[in-house]
């Protein structure tokens, strides 16, 4: 039978029928129906290596565990807010752990100390919840037993949900329990063909409850005896085959309709199980305020790997300075130098050999990079302190961004130039390469990378983003860049700035980019 977890500091008596699956009478508690409602949170203990295992190849054991913990923190906040509106709804936390019973019974040997520590963490997150270990041979039987437990406790409606759906809300919970009070069952479809939430009335018959949670057993029986369908009548065998191959949501929906009770279908939502889910939510963060402010939104960005891509050509001493500057960040980010030729590297960084041309170099290195975020940096730049955190913070609010710049040395003319460049991001929605452009790798490749042109690839890339309506951001911190393009006297610098302005204007009017590139090389 299922056992309650009350005080973690005291040993509880062992269950007399340990691991036994609960069984319901023919009609579930019809005579003792009450108006009490239960919210069942189904989860694992947040232990590294034992939770979110499909994320481990991507994020590692600790990273996967931290994703799970962030989801639990969001759920705890959601429940606190919801409970202020629906004080009569009781929270049950059904947890899964390899040593669940030992934790329940207070066994404090070395093998389960970690489980106990994580249980205490959950206790702090959910102080009002009743903790119960999951029981059953598969996930379906575990869910069935959780419902039986709450029904036997006198609850007329119970809603079971996982913590791995970022967009659950107070309003959605209120809608669910309103449906529960009106006698409806509830089912919420997840994007992968399963379901993220299921609500049941206690008056569901025992045979109907068995059917709702029987898919796991059907599939297991078929694995053990794949020839069993041949022994059935053709029409029965075909129906059995369809049920075995049905996705979990459709199978469960059919079983719920068969109860004869009205069914509320909730909005389809995406849970977080694998790398594709993390990528999808990371792309959504800049467009969703709730996700920006959530624990899971911040955790997804915190774990995003950054690849720093530096295009180089005839850099000389500038290259060694950049290598030295990046040395403290070797373990925090992937660093790739896109070598266009005639450079001398120290050998401590990854070098990608590319045909000469800044666009070609950056695109080639981007294909090799493994990061979730691509940061394109000019070799003559000096990075601000905390630039990696600044990048993640900027991408929390916009899908693509850059740093503000200032020139070294900072003369009055160059201060004006940097002001115009920084303001241009807001005013004209244009970023230049010397500002350090960064964005998610998916967006970069969706945009086709930098246009393969000999000049103004950064300018055209910005125009492409602008045309697609993609918002841009500007970091508060400033990146220092050299004024090597603007050598000479005050008037010579001014003439170069003016000529560059005219080159962009002529490019917008459709003049040949190769001819313009020759004029630009004359300037350099």
Predicted feature locations:
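Catalytic donor-sugar/metal-binding loop of nucleotide-sugar-dependent glycosyltransferases
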Residues: 256-264, 453, 463-480
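Conserved donor NDP-sugar-binding/catalytic core segment of glycosyltransferases
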Residues: 180-185, 386-413
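Short aromatic/hydrophobic "clamp" motif used to bind/position activated sugar donors
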Residues: 158, 374
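Acidic donor-binding/catalytic loop of UDP-sugar-dependent glycosyltransferases
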Residues: 163-176, 379-393, 463
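Acidic donor-binding loop at a coil-to-helix junction in glycosyltransferase catalytic cores
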Residues: 273, 455-461
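Glycine-rich, basic loop-to-helix element that forms the pyrophosphate-binding segment
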Residues: 140-146, 353-369
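Short beta-strand/loop segment that forms part of the nucleotide-sugar
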Residues: 90-97, 310, 322-327, 331-342, ...
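Short, well-formed alpha-helical segments that are part of the catalytic scaffolds
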Residues: 47-80, 314-329
């Amino acid at each position: 039978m299922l056992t309650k977890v009350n005080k973690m500091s005291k040993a509880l008596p062992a269950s007399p029928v340990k691991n036994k699956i609960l069984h319901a009478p023919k009609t579930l508690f019809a005579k003792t129906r009450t108006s009490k409602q239960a919210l069942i949170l189904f989860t694992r203990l947040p232990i590294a290596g034992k939770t979110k295992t499909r994320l481990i190849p991507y994020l590692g054991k600790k990273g996967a565990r931290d994703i799970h913990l962030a989801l639990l923190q969001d759920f705890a906040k959601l429940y606190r807010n919801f409970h202020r509106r629906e004080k009569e709804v009781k929270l049950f936390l059904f947890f899964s752990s390899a040593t669940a019973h030992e934790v329940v019974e207070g066994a404090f040997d070395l093998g389960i100390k970690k489980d106990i520590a994580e249980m205490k963490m959950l206790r702090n997150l959910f102080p009002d919840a009743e903790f119960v270990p999951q029981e059953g041979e598969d996930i379906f039987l575990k869910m069935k037993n959780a419902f039986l437990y709450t029904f036997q406790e006198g609850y007329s409606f119970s809603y079971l949900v996982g913590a791995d759906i970022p967009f659950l809300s107070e309003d959605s919970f209120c809608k669910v329990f309103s449906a529960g009070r009106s006698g409806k069952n509830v089912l919420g479809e997840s994007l992968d063909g399963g379901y993220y939430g299921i609500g049941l009335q206690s008056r569901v018959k025992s045979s109907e409850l068995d059917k709702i949670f029987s898919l796991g057993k059907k599939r297991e029986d078929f694995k053990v005896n794949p020839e069993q369908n041949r022994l059935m009548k053709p029409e029965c065998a075909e129906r059995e085959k369809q049920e075995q191959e049905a996705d979990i949501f459709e199978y469960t929906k059919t079983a719920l309709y068969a109860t004869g009770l009205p069914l509320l279908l909730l909005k389809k939502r995406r849970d977080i199980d694998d790398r594709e889910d993390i990528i999808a939510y990371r792309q959504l963060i800049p467009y969703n305020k709730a996700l920006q402010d959530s624990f899971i939104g911040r955790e997804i960005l915190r774990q995003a790997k950054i690849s720093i891509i530096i295009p180089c050509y005839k850099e000389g001493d500038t290259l060694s300075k950049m290598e030295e500057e990046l040395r403290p960040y070797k373990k925090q980010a992937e660093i790739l130098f896109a070598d266009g030729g005639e450079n001398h590297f120290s050998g401590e960084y990854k070098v990608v050999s590319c045909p000469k041309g800044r666009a070609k170099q950056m695109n080639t290195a981007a294909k090799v990079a493994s990061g979730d975020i691509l940061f394109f940096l000019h070799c003559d730049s000096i990075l601000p302190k905390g630039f990696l955190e600044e990048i993640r913070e900027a991408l929390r609010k916009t899908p693509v961004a850059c740093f503000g710049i200032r020139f070294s040395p900072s003369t009055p003319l160059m201060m004006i130039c940097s002001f115009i460049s920084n303001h241009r991001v807001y005013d004209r929605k244009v970023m230049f390469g010397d500002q350090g452009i960064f964005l998610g790798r998916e967006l970069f490749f969706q945009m086709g990378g930098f246009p393969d042109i000999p000049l103004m690839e950064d300018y055209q890339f910005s125009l492409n983003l602008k045309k697609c309506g993609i918002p841009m951001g500007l970091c508060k911190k400033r990146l220092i860049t050299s004024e090597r393009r603007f050598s000479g006297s005050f008037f010579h610098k001014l003439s170069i700035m003016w000529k560059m302005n005219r080159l962009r204007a002529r490019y917008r009017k459709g003049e040949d980019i190769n001819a313009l590139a020759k004029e630009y090389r004359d300037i350099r």
